Amino acid sequence: MLKNIVFDLGNVLVNFDSNELIYSFFNERQEEVKSFYFDSLWNEYDQGLYSVEEMIEKGVKQFPELELCIKKLMYHWTEFVIPLKDNVAYIKDLKRFGYKVYILSNIPEDDTKYLRSCGVFDNIDGGVFSYEYKKIKPDPEIFNILLEKYNLK
């Protein structure tokens, strides 16, 4: 019988739209900035390989004329991560029915702090986040970490 349910965060328990994020902070060169950050760097940020300051440094090196916008992007991007309240509330129902609920997500540390403050993790039994283990999905190792950490089958 099914006892454990594992959720992702992005577009499951929270909404995050990188287009909206980029277009909110940049009036010019949006596609270049989006490509620069979200084609590869963001995965490394999710893995915990770069701090916010290092992400700013990399962006400013690539786009020096956009320094202020890059700083705003990196200091305020979590404001664009919106909890999906109905989905988060559904976890309470699952808990009432006796399920254990876990999260497995590619996410940087600052985002987990923000989501904790929003109550997204209030009814979660545990989670594995990419920044903690320097691994991201779809690497099978991060799935194995979750299974072993919580003795899931």
Please tell me what each predicted stretch does.
Residues E20-S24, S40, E54, K58, ...:
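Alpha-helical elements of Rossmann-like donor-binding domains used by nucleotide-donor carbohydrate transfer enzymes
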